[in-house]
A protein has these predicted regions:
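Helix-terminus/linker motif at the lipid-water interface of multi-pass membrane proteins
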Residues: 39-57, 127-134, 190-197, 259-289, ...
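Hydrophobic transmembrane alpha-helices of multi-pass small-molecule transporters
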Residues: 69-72, 184-188, 214-218, 296, ...
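Short runs within selected transmembrane alpha-helices of multi-pass transporters and secretion channels
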Residues: 78, 147-165, 173-181, 202-215, ...
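Transmembrane helical elements of multi-pass membrane transporters/channels
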Residues: 25-44, 146, 157, 180, ...
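Small-residue-rich hydrophobic transmembrane alpha-helices
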Residues: 57-117, 154-173, 266, 284-350, ...
Length: 462
C-alpha cells in the first residue's frame, strides 16, 4: 500500500514538474476565472453607470454585500473541499478525497438555494441595513430582487470551479466562468439600452450568465470529471463537512469580513456624507466604483494564490517542502510585480478609471479621484495578505489561515473606519485604507517567514 502511495505521488506532475510552468498552468486559468467572475459586477456597474447614472452606481454598491456573502459560502465549500481533496490525493487517499468532493458539490447547491430564499424574504430590511438611502433604495430593490434568483447558480459556479481545478481541469474551470461573463456582457447593453429595462436589465443579464456557468459545472461533474464520484458520495457527511469547514473557513471569514466592512463603510459614508458638501449618495456611489476597481486587482492576486493552491497542498502532503517554499516565493514575486502596475494606474490615472463608470458632476469626480488615490495608496503591498491566507489554508494550517484572513478587514480596517471619521470626517474613511493595508502586510510577512523557516528546518533534518 505504501509503495502504491509513493508511486501515485511520483506520477503526479504537481510533485515533479517545474514550479514556474505549474503556476502558469494553474494560475492563468484561475486568474481569468477570477477576473471574469469580477466582471459580473464590474460590467453591470459600467453599463448601469452609463445608462442609469450615479444613483445606479450607488444601488449596486448597496446590493454588493449580498454578492460578497454568497461568495463567502461558495469559497467556504469550494476551497474547503478542494484543499482537502488535494491533501488527501497527495497522501494517496483517493476514495476519501472523492467523498469530500461529493459533499462539497452537493452543499454548494443547497447553500445557494437557502441564500436566495433568505434574500428574497428579507429584501427591504437587508438593503436598508446595508446602507441604502431613500433615493437609492428603489434602484437597489429592483437590482437585487432579480439577481437573488441566480444565487444558487452563482454559488455553485464560484465554488465548483475550485473542485474542477483540483480535478486537474483548470481550462474547463476558466471556460465555465468565461461563458457566463460573455453572455452577461452581451446582454447588458441589449437589456439596458436596447430594451430600455435600465437596472432591471442589468440584473437579468447577470442572472442568465450565472445560470449558464452553473449548468456547465453540473455538466462537468456528470460527464467529464476525472475523479471517482458516485451518487452516494453526493450525500453530505458530517465528517466531510467538518474537514471542509476547517480549511475553507479562512476564505469564508475573509469574505464575511469584507461584507462587514462594506456595510459599516456604507453606513459611515451615509452618515458623514450627509454632514459634508458631498451629501450621502456621492460617497456611496464612489466607494462602490473603487470597490469594483479593486476587485480587478484582487482577482489577479487571488487567482495566483488559487493557481498555487494545488501545488502547495500536494507537495506539503507529500513532504516536499522545498517545492512548497519555492512556489510561495514565486507567487509572491509575481503578485508584487502586478500590484505595482496597479498602484501606478491608481495614482496617475484616477479620472480615466472613474470615468469608465459613467459621467457625474465635478464634485462627484473630485471625491472619486481623491478616494481612489488615498484608499488604494498601499496597493503595491496588498497581495501578500490574501496570498498568505490561501497558503496556510492549502497546507492544512487552518487557524493561521483564518488569522491571516481577519487581519486587514477585521483587526485593522473595520475599527479604523469607525474611529477615524469621528476625528477627520468623511476623509477618515479614505485614510483608514492604507493604514490597514500596511499593518496587514507586516503581519503576513512575519507569519509567512516563520512558517517557511519551519519547513526549511524540517527539510534539513529529514
Amino acid at each position: 500500500m505504501k509503495n502504491q502511495t509513493n508511486a501515485a505521488q511520483a506520477e503526479n506532475p504537481l510533485g515533479t514538474a517545474p514550479v514556474g510552468s505549474l503556476i502558469t498552468k494553474f494560475a492563468i486559468p484561475a486568474i481569468i476565472s477570477m477576473l471574469v467572475s469580477a466582471l459580473y459586477n464590474i460590467v453591470d456597474q459600467i453599463f448601469i453607470g452609463q445608462g442609469v447614472g450615479m444613483l445606479g452606481n450607488a444601488a449596486t454598491n448597496i446590493a454588493f454585500p449580498v454578492t460578497i456573502i454568497s461568495t463567502a459560502a461558495a469559497l467556504l465549500l469550494g476551497i474547503g473541499s478542494a484543499s482537502n481533496y488535494n491533501l488527501e490525493m497527495g497522501a494517496g487517499n483517493e476514495k476519501k478525497a472523492s467523498s469530500i468532493a461529493g459533499t462539497g458539490l452537493s452543499t454548494l447547491i443547497i447553500s445557494g438555494t437557502i441564500l436566495s430564499v433568505i434574500v428574497l424574504l428579507f429584501l427591504k430590511p437587508l438593503l436598508h441595513f446595508f446602507g441604502g438611502t431613500p433615493d437609492v433604495m428603489p434602484y437597489a430593490i429592483d437590482y437585487i430582487g432579480i439577481t437573488a434568483i441566480g444565487l444558487p447558480f452563482y454559488v455553485l459556479s464560484t465554488g465548483g470551479n475550485h473542485l474542477i481545478r483540483a480535478d486537474r481541469s483548470p481550462t474547463y474551470s476558466m471556460a465555465c466562468i468565461l461563458a457566463g461573463a460573455a453572455i452577461n456582457t452581451i446582454l447588458d447593453p441589449l437589456f439596458i439600452f436596447g430594451f430600455g429595462w435600465g437596472i432591471k436589465g442589468a440584473a437579468w443579464a447577470t442572472v442568465i450568465g450565472q445560470i449558464v456557468s452553473g449548468l456547465l459545472i453540473i455538466f462537468y461533474f456528470s460527464r467529464l470529471r476525472k475523479m471517482y464520484l458516485d451518487h452516494s458520495m453526493l450525500i453530505p457527511k458530517a465528517r466531510n463537512l467538518s474537514a471542509i469547514f476547517s480549511l475553507g473557513m479562512a476564505s469564508c471569514i475573509n469574505q464575511v469580513a469584507i461584507a462587514a466592512v462594506q456595510i459599516v463603510m456604507n453606513n459611515t459614508l451615509r452618515h458623514y456624507g450627509a454632514l459634508s458638501a458631498y451629501g450621502s449618495d456621492i460617497p456611496i456611489a464612489c466607494a462602490g466604483i473603487i470597490s469594483k476597481v479593486n476587485q480587478v486587482f484582487m482577482a489577479i492576486c487571488i487567482g495566483i494564490s488559487q493557481g498555487s493552491q494545488p501545488i502547495w497542498g500536494f507537495n506539503y502532503g507529500a513532504k516536499k517542502y522545498s517545492r512548497v517554499r519555492q512556489t510561495y516565493r514565486y507567487s509572491v514575486t509575481l503578485c508584487t510585480v502586478i500590484a505595482t502596475i496597479f498602484f501606478i494606474c491608481f495614482q496617475f490615472f484616477p479620472h480615466q478609471i472613474v470615468g469608465i463608470f459613467g459621467n457625474g458632476s465635478d464634485l462627484y469626480f473630485h471625491f472619486a479621484e481623491k478616494y481612489l488615490r488615498i484608499f488604494m495608496l498601499m496597493t503595491f503591498a496588498n497581495g501578500i495578505q490574501p496570498m498568505s491566507a490561501c497558503f496556510f489554508t492549502s497546507i492544512g494550517k487552518a487557524r493561521l489561515g483564518v488569522i491571516m484572513s481577519l487581519t486587514r478587514q477585521v483587526l485593522f480596517l473595520l475599527p479604523l473606519i469607525v474611529i477615524f471619521p469621528v476625528f477627520f470626517g468623511i476623509d477618515g474613511v479614505m485614510y483608514a485604507g492604507p493604514i490597514a493595508d500596511t499593518s496587514a502586510f507586516v503581519l503576513a510577512v512575519v507569519f509567512a517567514r516563520r512558517e517557511l523557516g519551519v519547513m526549511k528546518a524540517a527539510e534539513q533534518n529529514a
